[in-house]
Amino acid sequence: MMQTILSNSIGMVLIILIINIIYVSFFTIRMILTLKGQRYFAAGISTIEILVYVTGLSLVLGNLNQIQNVIAYALGYGLGVIVGMKIEEKLALGYITVNVITKELDLDLPKQLREKGYGVTSWVAGGLEGDRTAMQILTPRKYELQLYDTIKTLDEKAFMIAFEPKTIHGGFWVKAVKKRRIKE
């Protein structure tokens, strides 16, 4: 049956396309895992990735006289990047740190965020137009959009900057954030 599919040019194009989407999705996820320090998981993914890659590449190189196979390979690569990024978004690996500065001094806002389950460090900061509340919030990435919505609901004019921390060590966050469940 596989021989029949491979001899059919449409079947060959579809197989090459699908194989390359799978390969590049694995590649994208592996790179993200590597950047996030998940080296052993990334190494496991790379083993599967290379098996898929060699299979797809051999199909294309064995049939270079058929331009549609090369085009399918290129399209699969582009689609694989998109699919890999979508998968990573769904996995939402790692943590984000959000720095928030309120429009006005609001000492109740950090308490409201803590009640919802977020780890918040807050302080009074001096701005151009007076004192404001500044906060630093660490949360798993899977709660990122929910955190933004919560902050906008509590202070629609709050200024926010988010980034992914490379290293987290010590303090309340290390144990508590891993166990924490954010409330709706």
Curated annotation (Swiss-Prot):
The protein's topology relative to the membrane is: Multi-pass membrane protein
Q: Which Pfam families match?
A: DUF2179 (PF10035), DUF5698 (PF18955)
Q: Which residues form a coiled coil?
A: none
Q: Which residues cross the membrane?
A: 9-29, 41-61, 67-87
Localization annotation: Cell membrane
Which Gene Ontology cellular component terms are annotated?
plasma membrane
Q: Which UniProt keywords apply?
A: Cell membrane, Membrane, Transmembrane, Transmembrane helix
Main localisation: membrane
Give the InterPro entries listed for this entry: DUF2179, DUF5698, UPF0316
Stored CDD domains? YitT_C_like_1
State the superkingdom: Bacteria
Similarity annotation: Belongs to the UPF0316 family.
Protein name, per record: UPF0316 protein RBAM_006820
